[in-house]
Protein backbone atom coordinates (compact mmCIF):
# COMPACT_ATOMS: atom_id res chain seq x y z
CA UNK A 1 0.00 0.00 0.00
CA UNK A 2 1.21 3.52 -0.78
CA UNK A 3 2.29 5.78 2.08
CA UNK A 4 -0.92 7.72 1.44
CA UNK A 5 -4.00 6.54 -0.45
CA UNK A 6 -6.38 9.38 0.47
CA UNK A 7 -6.39 12.90 1.87
CA UNK A 8 -7.79 13.04 5.41
CA UNK A 9 -10.48 15.59 4.64
CA UNK A 10 -11.71 13.59 1.63
CA UNK A 11 -12.40 10.35 3.48
CA UNK A 12 -16.19 10.08 3.37
CA UNK A 13 -18.93 7.45 3.19
CA UNK A 14 -17.91 6.43 -0.32
CA UNK A 15 -14.92 4.65 1.30
CA UNK A 16 -16.92 2.72 3.92
CA UNK A 17 -15.44 -0.73 4.49
CA UNK A 18 -12.17 0.09 2.75
CA UNK A 19 -8.68 0.15 4.20
CA UNK A 20 -6.91 3.48 3.74
CA UNK A 21 -3.49 4.92 4.43
CA UNK A 22 -3.46 8.52 5.66
CA UNK A 23 -0.67 10.98 6.44
CA UNK A 24 -0.95 14.23 8.32
CA UNK A 25 -0.56 16.11 11.57
CA UNK A 26 -2.13 15.42 14.94
CA UNK A 27 -4.61 18.25 15.35
CA UNK A 28 -5.93 16.97 18.66
CA UNK A 29 -5.52 13.81 20.75
CA UNK A 30 -8.15 12.70 23.28
CA UNK A 31 -8.05 9.72 25.67
CA UNK A 32 -11.58 8.52 26.46
CA UNK A 33 -11.68 5.61 28.88
CA UNK A 34 -8.91 3.62 27.31
CA UNK A 35 -9.77 4.49 23.72
CA UNK A 36 -7.63 7.18 22.03
CA UNK A 37 -9.18 9.52 19.47
CA UNK A 38 -6.90 11.43 17.10
CA UNK A 39 -8.11 14.23 14.85
CA UNK A 40 -5.73 13.86 11.92
CA UNK A 41 -5.29 16.93 9.71
CA UNK A 42 -3.94 17.54 6.24
CA UNK A 43 -4.54 20.24 3.67
CA UNK A 44 -8.01 18.90 2.83
CA UNK A 45 -9.31 18.85 6.40
CA UNK A 46 -9.77 16.55 9.39
CA UNK A 47 -10.68 12.92 9.94
CA UNK A 48 -11.25 11.15 13.25
CA UNK A 49 -8.97 8.18 13.93
CA UNK A 50 -9.96 5.66 16.63
CA UNK A 51 -7.19 3.71 18.39
CA UNK A 52 -8.39 0.64 20.37
CA UNK A 53 -6.10 -0.97 22.96
CA UNK A 54 -6.61 -4.37 21.24
CA UNK A 55 -3.58 -3.68 19.04
CA UNK A 56 -0.91 -3.19 21.68
CA UNK A 57 1.94 -1.91 19.48
CA UNK A 58 -0.27 0.57 17.65
CA UNK A 59 -1.89 1.72 20.88
CA UNK A 60 1.47 2.33 22.54
CA UNK A 61 2.47 4.52 19.60
CA UNK A 62 -0.84 6.41 19.85
CA UNK A 63 -0.26 7.07 23.56
CA UNK A 64 3.01 8.82 22.70
CA UNK A 65 1.78 11.20 20.02
CA UNK A 66 1.05 14.85 20.76
CA UNK A 67 -0.25 17.85 18.84
CA UNK A 68 1.56 18.52 15.54
CA UNK A 69 3.29 15.14 15.39
CA UNK A 70 3.50 14.07 11.74
CA UNK A 71 2.12 10.53 11.51
CA UNK A 72 0.93 7.84 9.12
CA UNK A 73 -2.22 5.88 9.90
CA UNK A 74 -3.51 2.73 8.22
CA UNK A 75 -6.99 1.58 9.08
CA UNK A 76 -10.56 0.68 8.20
CA UNK A 77 -13.17 3.29 7.29
CA UNK A 78 -16.38 2.73 9.25
CA UNK A 79 -19.51 4.69 10.08
CA UNK A 80 -19.58 6.67 13.30
CA UNK A 81 -21.82 5.34 16.07
CA UNK A 82 -25.27 6.92 16.42
CA UNK A 83 -25.11 10.27 18.19
CA UNK A 84 -21.45 10.97 17.35
CA UNK A 85 -21.88 12.31 13.82
CA UNK A 86 -20.21 15.71 13.28
CA UNK A 87 -22.17 17.60 10.62
CA UNK A 88 -19.54 20.35 10.62
CA UNK A 89 -16.92 18.08 9.03
CA UNK A 90 -16.87 16.73 5.49
CA UNK A 91 -15.67 13.45 7.04
CA UNK A 92 -18.05 13.80 9.98
CA UNK A 93 -20.12 10.66 9.26
CA UNK A 94 -17.17 8.28 9.30
CA UNK A 95 -14.10 7.44 11.34
CA UNK A 96 -10.98 5.38 10.71
CA UNK A 97 -10.33 2.39 12.98
CA UNK A 98 -6.55 2.42 13.28
CA UNK A 99 -4.65 -0.79 12.51
CA UNK A 100 -1.18 0.70 12.24
CA UNK A 101 0.32 4.03 13.37
CA UNK A 102 3.79 5.25 12.40
CA UNK A 103 5.34 8.43 13.75
CA UNK A 104 7.01 10.04 10.75
CA UNK A 105 8.35 12.92 12.83
CA UNK A 106 7.79 14.15 16.35
CA UNK A 107 7.11 17.80 17.18
CA UNK A 108 8.27 19.96 20.04
CA UNK A 109 5.46 21.75 21.87
CA UNK A 110 4.16 24.44 19.49
CA UNK A 111 4.34 28.06 20.72
CA UNK A 112 0.57 28.40 20.24
CA UNK A 113 -2.54 26.39 19.51
CA UNK A 114 -3.53 26.47 15.86
CA UNK A 115 -7.13 27.26 16.79
CA UNK A 116 -6.13 30.33 18.85
CA UNK A 117 -7.73 33.31 17.08
CA UNK A 118 -6.17 35.94 19.37
CA UNK A 119 -2.53 35.70 18.32
CA UNK A 120 -0.52 38.84 17.66
CA UNK A 121 0.71 39.37 14.12
CA UNK A 122 4.28 39.32 15.42
CA UNK A 123 3.78 35.82 16.81
CA UNK A 124 2.12 34.63 13.63
CA UNK A 125 4.81 36.01 11.31
CA UNK A 126 7.69 34.82 13.50
CA UNK A 127 6.28 31.27 13.44
CA UNK A 128 4.84 31.57 9.94
CA UNK A 129 5.31 27.89 9.07
CA UNK A 130 2.99 26.88 11.91
CA UNK A 131 0.65 29.78 11.18
CA UNK A 132 0.29 28.52 7.60
CA UNK A 133 -1.03 25.20 8.93
CA UNK A 134 -4.11 26.99 10.24
CA UNK A 135 -7.27 26.23 8.21
CA UNK A 136 -7.90 29.89 7.36
CA UNK A 137 -4.41 30.36 5.94
CA UNK A 138 -4.70 27.12 3.99
CA UNK A 139 -8.00 28.39 2.58
CA UNK A 140 -6.57 31.81 1.69
CA UNK A 141 -3.57 30.49 -0.21
CA UNK A 142 -5.60 27.90 -2.08
CA UNK A 143 -8.05 30.65 -3.02
CA UNK A 144 -5.11 32.67 -4.30
CA UNK A 145 -4.04 29.71 -6.42
CA UNK A 146 -7.54 29.34 -7.88
CA UNK A 147 -7.73 33.06 -8.73
CA UNK A 148 -4.40 32.83 -10.57
CA UNK A 149 -5.51 29.69 -12.44
CA UNK A 150 -8.79 31.28 -13.56
CA UNK A 151 -6.99 34.43 -14.70
CA UNK A 152 -4.64 32.29 -16.77
CA UNK A 153 -7.53 30.31 -18.26
CA UNK A 154 -9.39 33.45 -19.30
CA UNK A 155 -6.34 35.17 -20.75
CA UNK A 156 -5.29 32.05 -22.62
CA UNK A 157 -8.76 31.78 -24.18
CA UNK A 158 -8.49 35.43 -25.26
CA UNK A 159 -5.20 34.84 -27.06
CA UNK A 160 -2.79 36.29 -24.49
CA UNK A 161 0.76 34.92 -24.32
CA UNK A 162 2.57 34.51 -20.99
CA UNK A 163 5.99 36.13 -21.42
CA UNK A 164 8.49 36.71 -18.61
CA UNK A 165 10.23 40.06 -18.38
CA UNK A 166 13.52 40.82 -16.55
CA UNK A 167 13.79 41.06 -12.78
CA UNK A 168 17.12 42.88 -13.03
CA UNK A 169 16.51 46.06 -14.96
CA UNK A 170 17.30 49.76 -15.21
CA UNK A 171 16.49 52.25 -12.47
CA UNK A 172 14.08 54.94 -13.69
CA UNK A 173 13.17 56.82 -10.51
CA UNK A 174 9.85 58.40 -11.52
CA UNK A 175 7.54 57.65 -8.58
CA UNK A 176 8.23 55.25 -5.71
CA UNK A 177 11.79 54.38 -4.70
CA UNK A 178 13.50 51.51 -6.48
CA UNK A 179 15.07 48.51 -4.79
CA UNK A 180 18.64 48.61 -6.07
CA UNK A 181 20.92 45.62 -6.74
CA UNK A 182 24.66 46.36 -7.01
CA UNK A 183 26.53 44.85 -9.95
CA UNK A 184 29.69 42.93 -9.06
CA UNK A 185 30.87 42.81 -12.67
CA UNK A 186 30.16 46.46 -13.45
CA UNK A 187 31.67 48.28 -10.48
CA UNK A 188 29.68 51.22 -9.16
CA UNK A 189 26.61 50.41 -11.23
CA UNK A 190 23.25 49.09 -10.14
CA UNK A 191 20.28 47.15 -11.37
CA UNK A 192 16.80 47.93 -10.07
CA UNK A 193 14.09 45.43 -9.24
CA UNK A 194 11.06 46.31 -11.39
CA UNK A 195 8.25 48.41 -9.95
CA UNK A 196 6.24 46.98 -12.83
CA UNK A 197 7.01 45.42 -16.23
CA UNK A 198 5.62 48.61 -17.83
CA UNK A 199 8.29 49.41 -20.40
CA UNK A 200 9.04 45.81 -21.30
CA UNK A 201 5.40 45.02 -21.99
CA UNK A 202 5.17 48.08 -24.23
CA UNK A 203 8.27 46.87 -26.08
CA UNK A 204 6.58 43.47 -26.52
CA UNK A 205 3.71 45.23 -28.26
CA UNK A 206 6.18 46.97 -30.59
CA UNK A 207 7.71 43.50 -31.15
CA UNK A 208 4.34 42.19 -32.49
CA UNK A 209 3.30 39.84 -29.67
CA UNK A 210 -0.10 41.57 -29.74
CA UNK A 211 -1.41 40.22 -26.41
CA UNK A 212 0.86 39.68 -23.41
CA UNK A 213 0.36 38.80 -19.77
CA UNK A 214 2.27 37.52 -16.80
CA UNK A 215 1.57 37.00 -13.12
CA UNK A 216 4.67 38.58 -11.71
CA UNK A 217 6.38 40.05 -8.68
CA UNK A 218 6.90 43.81 -8.50
CA UNK A 219 8.93 45.80 -5.99
CA UNK A 220 8.50 49.26 -4.48
CA UNK A 221 10.50 50.69 -1.61
CA UNK A 222 7.66 52.65 -0.02
CA UNK A 223 6.06 53.04 3.38
CA UNK A 224 3.75 50.12 4.10
CA UNK A 225 0.04 50.09 4.97
CA UNK A 226 -2.54 47.36 5.33
CA UNK A 227 -2.72 47.01 1.55
CA UNK A 228 0.98 47.51 0.73
CA UNK A 229 4.03 45.22 0.61
CA UNK A 230 7.56 45.89 -0.67
CA UNK A 231 7.07 42.96 -3.04
CA UNK A 232 3.64 42.30 -4.46
CA UNK A 233 2.08 40.32 -7.29
CA UNK A 234 0.39 41.73 -10.38
CA UNK A 235 -1.71 40.16 -13.10
CA UNK A 236 -0.02 42.28 -15.73
CA UNK A 237 -1.53 42.61 -19.22
CA UNK A 238 -0.99 44.54 -22.44
CA UNK A 239 -2.73 44.42 -25.82
CA UNK A 240 -2.39 46.06 -29.23
CA UNK A 241 -4.99 47.57 -31.56
CA UNK A 242 -7.74 48.02 -28.96
CA UNK A 243 -9.25 51.28 -27.77
CA UNK A 244 -9.91 52.30 -24.18
CA UNK A 245 -13.50 51.01 -24.12
CA UNK A 246 -12.51 47.66 -25.66
CA UNK A 247 -9.72 47.19 -23.12
CA UNK A 248 -12.07 47.94 -20.23
CA UNK A 249 -14.69 45.52 -21.58
CA UNK A 250 -12.12 42.75 -21.98
CA UNK A 251 -10.81 42.96 -18.43
CA UNK A 252 -14.18 43.64 -16.86
CA UNK A 253 -15.20 40.25 -18.28
CA UNK A 254 -12.05 38.71 -16.78
CA UNK A 255 -12.86 39.95 -13.29
CA UNK A 256 -16.46 38.75 -13.62
CA UNK A 257 -15.15 35.33 -14.70
CA UNK A 258 -12.72 35.11 -11.77
CA UNK A 259 -15.33 36.04 -9.16
CA UNK A 260 -17.91 33.63 -10.55
CA UNK A 261 -15.59 30.63 -10.87
CA UNK A 262 -13.69 31.04 -7.59
CA UNK A 263 -16.24 32.26 -5.03
CA UNK A 264 -19.53 31.96 -6.90
CA UNK A 265 -20.21 35.71 -6.99
CA UNK A 266 -22.04 37.23 -9.96
CA UNK A 267 -20.77 40.79 -10.37
CA UNK A 268 -22.82 43.43 -12.20
CA UNK A 269 -23.37 42.72 -15.90
CA UNK A 270 -21.97 46.17 -16.66
CA UNK A 271 -19.70 48.15 -14.34
CA UNK A 272 -20.65 51.83 -14.00
CA UNK A 273 -18.13 54.33 -15.37
CA UNK A 274 -17.41 57.51 -13.39
CA UNK A 275 -15.11 60.40 -14.33
CA UNK A 276 -12.41 61.23 -11.80
CA UNK A 277 -13.86 64.72 -11.31
CA UNK A 278 -17.27 63.30 -10.39
CA UNK A 279 -15.76 60.77 -7.97
CA UNK A 280 -13.86 63.52 -6.16
CA UNK A 281 -16.89 65.84 -6.09
CA UNK A 282 -19.31 63.24 -4.75
CA UNK A 283 -17.07 61.09 -2.56
CA UNK A 284 -13.75 62.89 -2.08
CA UNK A 285 -11.95 59.81 -3.39
CA UNK A 286 -10.83 58.37 -6.72
CA UNK A 287 -11.67 54.91 -5.37
CA UNK A 288 -15.17 55.39 -3.94
CA UNK A 289 -16.88 52.67 -1.93
CA UNK A 290 -20.32 52.67 -3.54
CA UNK A 291 -21.74 50.44 -0.81
CA UNK A 292 -21.94 53.53 1.42
CA UNK A 293 -25.04 55.60 0.57
CA UNK A 294 -23.63 58.96 1.66
CA UNK A 295 -22.39 61.70 -0.68
CA UNK A 296 -20.82 65.13 -0.44
CA UNK A 297 -22.75 68.32 -1.14
CA UNK A 298 -20.73 71.12 -2.74
CA UNK A 299 -21.01 74.42 -0.84
CA UNK A 300 -17.90 76.33 -1.90
CA UNK A 301 -19.72 78.86 -4.08
CA UNK A 302 -22.47 79.40 -1.49
CA UNK A 303 -20.01 80.18 1.31
CA UNK A 304 -17.92 82.87 -0.41
CA UNK A 305 -19.80 85.80 1.17
CA UNK A 306 -20.61 84.48 4.66
CA UNK A 307 -19.20 86.22 7.71
CA UNK A 308 -18.04 82.88 9.13
CA UNK A 309 -14.32 82.94 8.24
CA UNK A 310 -13.96 79.17 8.78
CA UNK A 311 -16.11 78.74 5.65
CA UNK A 312 -15.48 81.92 3.66
CA UNK A 313 -11.68 81.81 3.73
CA UNK A 314 -11.29 78.40 1.99
CA UNK A 315 -14.28 79.23 -0.23
CA UNK A 316 -12.31 82.18 -1.61
CA UNK A 317 -8.99 80.34 -1.84
CA UNK A 318 -7.83 78.93 -5.18
CA UNK A 319 -7.41 75.35 -3.94
CA UNK A 320 -10.01 75.61 -1.16
CA UNK A 321 -13.25 73.69 -0.78
CA UNK A 322 -16.31 73.71 1.48
CA UNK A 323 -18.40 70.53 1.44
CA UNK A 324 -21.14 68.96 3.53
CA UNK A 325 -22.02 65.37 4.39
CA UNK A 326 -25.66 64.77 5.28
CA UNK A 327 -26.24 61.74 7.50
CA UNK A 328 -29.90 60.63 7.55
CA UNK A 329 -31.19 60.02 11.10
CA UNK A 330 -27.85 61.33 12.38
CA UNK A 331 -29.67 63.54 14.87
CA UNK A 332 -29.56 60.61 17.28
CA UNK A 333 -25.76 60.73 17.40
CA UNK A 334 -24.58 61.83 20.84
CA UNK A 335 -22.17 64.65 21.60
CA UNK A 336 -19.66 61.94 22.48
CA UNK A 337 -20.08 60.43 19.01
CA UNK A 338 -19.56 63.84 17.40
CA UNK A 339 -16.48 64.54 19.53
CA UNK A 340 -15.09 61.16 18.46
CA UNK A 341 -15.64 61.99 14.80
CA UNK A 342 -13.99 65.38 15.34
CA UNK A 343 -10.84 63.71 16.65
CA UNK A 344 -11.00 61.20 13.80
CA UNK A 345 -10.94 63.82 11.02
CA UNK A 346 -7.93 65.51 12.63
CA UNK A 347 -5.93 62.45 11.51
CA UNK A 348 -6.47 63.67 7.94
CA UNK A 349 -5.42 67.26 8.61
CA UNK A 350 -8.83 68.78 9.42
CA UNK A 351 -8.76 71.47 12.10
CA UNK A 352 -12.20 70.51 13.39
CA UNK A 353 -15.65 69.29 12.37
CA UNK A 354 -18.58 71.69 12.11
CA UNK A 355 -22.10 70.24 12.32
CA UNK A 356 -25.79 71.10 12.29
CA UNK A 357 -28.57 68.91 13.65
CA UNK A 358 -31.88 69.40 11.86
CA UNK A 359 -34.59 69.06 14.50
CA UNK A 360 -37.48 70.85 12.71
CA UNK A 361 -36.60 72.16 9.28
CA UNK A 362 -39.93 74.01 8.96
CA UNK A 363 -38.86 76.33 11.79
CA UNK A 364 -35.80 77.50 9.87
CA UNK A 365 -32.95 78.73 12.07
CA UNK A 366 -34.93 77.97 15.25
CA UNK A 367 -35.28 74.32 14.27
CA UNK A 368 -31.54 73.79 14.04
CA UNK A 369 -29.09 72.76 16.76
CA UNK A 370 -25.47 73.76 16.18
CA UNK A 371 -22.67 75.95 17.52
CA UNK A 372 -22.15 77.48 14.05
CA UNK A 373 -25.70 78.57 13.11
CA UNK A 374 -25.23 81.96 14.79
CA UNK A 375 -22.37 82.67 12.35
CA UNK A 376 -24.43 82.06 9.20
CA UNK A 377 -27.03 84.35 7.63
CA UNK A 378 -30.45 83.03 6.65
CA UNK A 379 -29.64 82.74 2.94
CA UNK A 380 -26.61 80.54 3.68
CA UNK A 381 -28.64 78.31 6.01
CA UNK A 382 -31.36 78.01 3.38
CA UNK A 383 -28.76 77.06 0.75
CA UNK A 384 -27.28 74.39 3.03
CA UNK A 385 -30.68 72.84 3.78
CA UNK A 386 -31.82 73.01 0.16
CA UNK A 387 -28.66 71.58 -1.38
CA UNK A 388 -28.22 68.77 1.13
CA UNK A 389 -31.91 67.84 1.10
CA UNK A 390 -31.79 67.63 4.88
CA UNK A 391 -34.84 66.25 6.69
CA UNK A 392 -35.91 66.36 10.31
CA UNK A 393 -33.68 64.08 12.38
CA UNK A 394 -30.63 64.43 10.10
CA UNK A 395 -27.19 65.77 10.94
CA UNK A 396 -24.98 67.66 8.49
CA UNK A 397 -21.19 67.58 8.89
CA UNK A 398 -18.98 70.19 7.23
CA UNK A 399 -15.36 70.37 6.10
CA UNK A 400 -13.72 73.60 4.95
CA UNK A 401 -10.03 73.72 4.06
CA UNK A 402 -7.74 72.99 1.16
CA UNK A 403 -9.55 70.63 -1.21
CA UNK A 404 -7.21 67.74 -0.39
CA UNK A 405 -7.87 68.05 3.35
CA UNK A 406 -11.64 68.28 2.77
CA UNK A 407 -11.63 65.28 0.46
CA UNK A 408 -9.45 63.15 2.72
CA UNK A 409 -11.16 64.00 6.01
CA UNK A 410 -14.80 64.06 4.91
CA UNK A 411 -14.21 61.04 2.66
CA UNK A 412 -12.81 59.05 5.59
CA UNK A 413 -15.70 60.21 7.80
CA UNK A 414 -18.17 59.06 5.14
CA UNK A 415 -16.72 55.55 5.26
CA UNK A 416 -16.43 55.46 9.04
CA UNK A 417 -20.06 56.45 9.59
CA UNK A 418 -21.34 54.27 6.76
CA UNK A 419 -19.64 51.12 8.04
CA UNK A 420 -20.35 51.83 11.73
CA UNK A 421 -23.03 49.99 13.70
CA UNK A 422 -25.12 53.16 13.41
CA UNK A 423 -24.67 53.12 9.63
CA UNK A 424 -25.60 49.45 9.34
CA UNK A 425 -28.65 49.86 11.58
CA UNK A 426 -29.92 52.81 9.53
CA UNK A 427 -29.33 51.38 6.07
CA UNK A 428 -26.43 53.66 5.19
CA UNK A 429 -24.36 50.80 3.77
CA UNK A 430 -25.20 47.90 1.47
CA UNK A 431 -23.78 44.40 1.54
CA UNK A 432 -22.24 42.78 -1.51
CA UNK A 433 -19.91 43.93 -4.26
CA UNK A 434 -19.95 47.35 -5.93
CA UNK A 435 -17.47 47.60 -8.82
CA UNK A 436 -16.94 50.62 -11.04
CA UNK A 437 -14.46 52.18 -13.44
CA UNK A 438 -12.97 55.58 -12.65
CA UNK A 439 -11.77 57.31 -15.83
CA UNK A 440 -10.51 60.63 -17.21
CA UNK A 441 -7.79 61.17 -14.62
CA UNK A 442 -5.61 64.28 -14.71
CA UNK A 443 -2.52 63.60 -16.78
CA UNK A 444 -0.27 65.60 -14.45
CA UNK A 445 -0.10 66.87 -10.88
CA UNK A 446 1.88 69.95 -9.90
CA UNK A 447 4.64 69.39 -7.35
CA UNK A 448 5.21 72.62 -5.41
CA UNK A 449 8.51 71.43 -3.93
CA UNK A 450 10.01 70.54 -7.30
CA UNK A 451 8.20 73.42 -9.05
CA UNK A 452 7.20 71.19 -11.95
CA UNK A 453 4.49 68.83 -13.12
CA UNK A 454 4.80 65.12 -12.30
CA UNK A 455 2.94 62.25 -13.94
CA UNK A 456 -0.27 61.38 -12.10
CA UNK A 457 0.00 57.73 -13.19
CA UNK A 458 3.22 57.27 -15.16
CA UNK A 459 4.77 59.23 -18.02
CA UNK A 460 3.82 56.65 -20.67
CA UNK A 461 0.06 57.22 -20.39
CA UNK A 462 -1.54 58.78 -23.44
CA UNK A 463 -3.39 62.09 -23.12
CA UNK A 464 -6.91 62.25 -24.50
CA UNK A 465 -6.77 63.10 -28.21
CA UNK A 466 -8.48 66.45 -27.77
CA UNK A 467 -5.97 67.43 -25.07
CA UNK A 468 -2.76 66.83 -27.03
CA UNK A 469 -2.36 70.57 -27.63
CA UNK A 470 -2.26 71.24 -23.87
CA UNK A 471 1.00 69.29 -23.48
CA UNK A 472 2.94 72.36 -24.57
CA UNK A 473 0.55 75.14 -23.55
CA UNK A 474 -1.21 74.11 -20.32
CA UNK A 475 -0.27 70.61 -19.03
CA UNK A 476 -2.53 71.00 -15.98
CA UNK A 477 -5.59 70.83 -18.26
CA UNK A 478 -4.60 67.48 -19.81
CA UNK A 479 -6.76 64.48 -19.06
CA UNK A 480 -5.37 60.99 -19.58
CA UNK A 481 -6.69 57.86 -21.23
CA UNK A 482 -6.32 56.18 -17.85
CA UNK A 483 -8.76 53.93 -16.02
CA UNK A 484 -8.89 52.28 -12.61
CA UNK A 485 -11.13 49.40 -11.64
CA UNK A 486 -12.46 50.00 -8.12
CA UNK A 487 -14.26 47.47 -5.96
CA UNK A 488 -15.76 48.32 -2.56
CA UNK A 489 -13.39 51.22 -2.07
CA UNK A 490 -10.23 49.39 -3.18
CA UNK A 491 -8.40 50.00 -6.43
CA UNK A 492 -7.91 46.45 -7.70
CA UNK A 493 -6.61 47.34 -11.15
CA UNK A 494 -5.23 50.29 -13.03
CA UNK A 495 -4.19 50.89 -16.59
CA UNK A 496 -4.19 53.19 -19.56
CA UNK A 497 -3.83 53.55 -23.28
CA UNK A 498 -0.11 54.17 -23.87
CA UNK A 499 1.72 56.71 -25.97
CA UNK A 500 2.77 54.94 -29.18
CA UNK A 501 4.30 57.88 -31.08
CA UNK A 502 7.80 59.08 -30.26
CA UNK A 503 7.01 62.77 -30.80
CA UNK A 504 4.12 62.64 -28.29
CA UNK A 505 6.27 60.79 -25.74
CA UNK A 506 8.96 63.45 -26.11
CA UNK A 507 6.37 66.20 -25.56
CA UNK A 508 5.27 64.50 -22.33
CA UNK A 509 8.87 64.32 -21.14
CA UNK A 510 9.26 68.04 -21.86
CA UNK A 511 6.07 68.80 -19.91
CA UNK A 512 7.65 66.90 -17.00
CA UNK A 513 10.84 68.99 -17.33
CA UNK A 514 12.76 65.92 -18.48
CA UNK A 515 15.20 67.29 -21.04
CA UNK A 516 16.32 65.47 -24.22
CA UNK A 517 19.60 64.26 -22.70
CA UNK A 518 17.95 62.94 -19.55
CA UNK A 519 15.15 61.35 -21.58
CA UNK A 520 17.68 59.62 -23.83
CA UNK A 521 19.73 58.42 -20.86
CA UNK A 522 16.72 57.00 -18.99
CA UNK A 523 14.33 56.01 -21.75
CA UNK A 524 16.32 56.04 -24.99
CA UNK A 525 15.52 52.38 -25.69
CA UNK A 526 11.78 53.17 -25.54
CA UNK A 527 12.02 56.30 -27.68
CA UNK A 528 14.01 54.35 -30.27
CA UNK A 529 11.49 51.50 -30.32
CA UNK A 530 8.55 53.87 -30.79
CA UNK A 531 10.10 55.01 -34.09
CA UNK A 532 9.75 51.55 -35.66
CA UNK A 533 6.02 51.56 -36.34
CA UNK A 534 4.86 51.04 -32.77
CA UNK A 535 1.17 50.02 -32.75
CA UNK A 536 -1.55 51.67 -30.67
CA UNK A 537 -1.59 49.71 -27.43
CA UNK A 538 -2.74 49.77 -23.83
CA UNK A 539 -3.18 47.54 -20.86
CA UNK A 540 -3.87 47.10 -17.20
CA UNK A 541 -2.40 45.51 -14.09
CA UNK A 542 -4.46 43.92 -11.33
CA UNK A 543 -3.24 43.53 -7.76
CA UNK A 544 -3.55 39.80 -7.10
CA UNK A 545 -2.91 40.29 -3.38
CA UNK A 546 -5.71 42.85 -3.06
CA UNK A 547 -8.24 40.81 -5.03
CA UNK A 548 -7.65 37.70 -2.92
CA UNK A 549 -7.71 39.75 0.30
CA UNK A 550 -11.18 41.02 -0.57
CA UNK A 551 -12.46 37.61 -1.64
CA UNK A 552 -11.16 35.98 1.54
CA UNK A 553 -12.53 38.73 3.78
CA UNK A 554 -9.04 39.06 5.27
CA UNK A 555 -7.91 42.03 7.35
CA UNK A 556 -4.63 42.52 5.48
CA UNK A 557 -2.87 41.36 2.34
CA UNK A 558 -0.37 39.74 4.71
CA UNK A 559 -3.09 37.13 5.31
CA UNK A 560 -3.06 36.03 1.66
CA UNK A 561 0.73 35.99 1.08
CA UNK A 562 2.68 32.94 2.22
CA UNK A 563 5.73 34.79 3.57
CA UNK A 564 4.95 38.52 3.84
CA UNK A 565 6.94 41.39 5.26
CA UNK A 566 5.89 43.50 8.24
CA UNK A 567 5.05 47.20 8.09
CA UNK A 568 8.77 47.80 8.65
CA UNK A 569 9.54 45.74 5.52
CA UNK A 570 11.05 42.92 7.58
CA UNK A 571 10.58 39.16 7.41
CA UNK A 572 10.26 37.99 11.01
CA UNK A 573 10.67 34.35 9.96
CA UNK A 574 14.07 34.67 8.26
CA UNK A 575 15.15 37.92 9.94
CA UNK A 576 15.63 39.59 6.55
CA UNK A 577 17.01 42.11 5.82
CA UNK A 578 20.23 41.25 7.63
CA UNK A 579 23.89 42.31 7.63
CA UNK A 580 26.28 40.74 5.12
CA UNK A 581 29.96 40.09 5.65
CA UNK A 582 32.72 42.46 4.58
CA UNK A 583 33.98 40.15 1.85
CA UNK A 584 30.64 40.29 0.02
CA UNK A 585 30.63 44.07 0.25
CA UNK A 586 34.16 44.31 -1.16
CA UNK A 587 33.18 42.09 -4.11
CA UNK A 588 30.34 44.51 -4.81
CA UNK A 589 32.63 47.55 -4.45
CA UNK A 590 30.49 48.87 -1.58
CA UNK A 591 31.64 50.58 1.60
CA UNK A 592 29.07 51.17 4.35
CA UNK A 593 28.74 54.59 5.91
CA UNK A 594 27.79 54.64 9.57
CA UNK A 595 24.39 56.27 10.16
CA UNK A 596 24.61 59.70 11.73
CA UNK A 597 24.01 59.69 15.47
CA UNK A 598 21.27 62.03 16.68
CA UNK A 599 22.64 65.11 18.42
CA UNK A 600 22.23 65.21 22.18
UniProtKB/Swiss-Prot annotation:
**Keyword presence, rRNA-binding:** no
Any one Pfam family here would be tRNA-synt_2
Q: Which GO terms describe its biological process?
A: aspartyl-tRNA aminoacylation
Q: What class of enzyme is it?
A: ligase
- Primary subcellular site in the record, as a coarse category: cytoplasm
A GO molecular-function term, please? aspartate-tRNA(Asn) ligase activity
Q: Where does L-aspartate bind?
A: 174, 220, 457, 498
Matching InterPro entries = Aa-tRNA-synt_II, aa-tRNA-synth_II, aa-tRNA-synth_II/BPL/LPL, Asp-tRNA-ligase_1, Asp-tRNA-ligase_1_N, Asp/Asn-tRNA-synth_IIb, AspRS_core, GAD-like_sf
What's the Enzyme Commission number for this chain? 6.1.1.23
Give the record's keywords alphabetically. Answer: Aminoacyl-tRNA synthetase, ATP-binding, Cytoplasm, Ligase, Nucleotide-binding, Protein biosynthesis
Q: Which residues bind ATP?
A: 220-222, 229, 491, 543-546
GO CC annotations, alphabetized: cytoplasm
Important for tRNA non-discrimination (site feature) positions: 32, 83
Location(s), subcellular: Cytoplasm
Record-linked CDD domains: AspRS_core (cd00777), EcAspRS_like_N (cd04317)
Q: List the catalytic activities from the record.
A: tRNA(Asx) + L-aspartate + ATP = L-aspartyl-tRNA(Asx) + AMP + diphosphate
Q: Where is this region: Aspartate?
A: 198-201
Q: Which PANTHER family match?
A: ASPARTATE--TRNA LIGASE, MITOCHONDRIAL, ASPARTYL/LYSYL-TRNA SYNTHETASE
* Function according to Swiss-Prot or TrEMBL: Aspartyl-tRNA synthetase with relaxed tRNA specificity since it is able to aspartylate not only its cognate tRNA(Asp) but also tRNA(Asn). Reaction proceeds in two steps: L-aspartate is first activated by ATP to form Asp-AMP and then transferred to the acceptor end of tRNA(Asp/Asn).
What is the protein's quaternary organization? Answer: Homodimer.
- Family listed: Belongs to the class-II aminoacyl-tRNA synthetase family. Type 1 subfamily.
Q: What is this protein called?
A: Aspartate--tRNA(Asp/Asn) ligase
Q: Which organism is it from?
A: Burkholderia mallei (strain SAVP1)
Q: What is the lineage of its organism?
A: Bacteria, Pseudomonadati, Pseudomonadota, Betaproteobacteria, Burkholderiales
Amino acid sequence: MSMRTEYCGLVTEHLLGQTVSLCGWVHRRRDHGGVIFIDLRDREGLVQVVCDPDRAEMFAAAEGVRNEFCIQVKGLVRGRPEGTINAGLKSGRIEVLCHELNVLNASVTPPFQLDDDNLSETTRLTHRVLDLRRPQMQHNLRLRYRVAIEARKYLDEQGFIDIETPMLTKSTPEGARDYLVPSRVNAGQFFALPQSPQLFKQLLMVANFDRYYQITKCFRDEDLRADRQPEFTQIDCETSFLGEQEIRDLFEDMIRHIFKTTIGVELDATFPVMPYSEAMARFGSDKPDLRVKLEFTELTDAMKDVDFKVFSTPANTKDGRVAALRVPKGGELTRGDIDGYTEFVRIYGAKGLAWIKVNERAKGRDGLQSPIVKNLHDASIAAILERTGAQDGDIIFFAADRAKVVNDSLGALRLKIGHSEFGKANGLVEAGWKPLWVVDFPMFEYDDEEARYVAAHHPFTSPKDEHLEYLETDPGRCLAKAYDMVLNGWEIGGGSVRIHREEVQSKVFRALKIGPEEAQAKFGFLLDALQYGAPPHGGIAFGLDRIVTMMAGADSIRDVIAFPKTQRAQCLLTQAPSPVDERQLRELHIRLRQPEQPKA
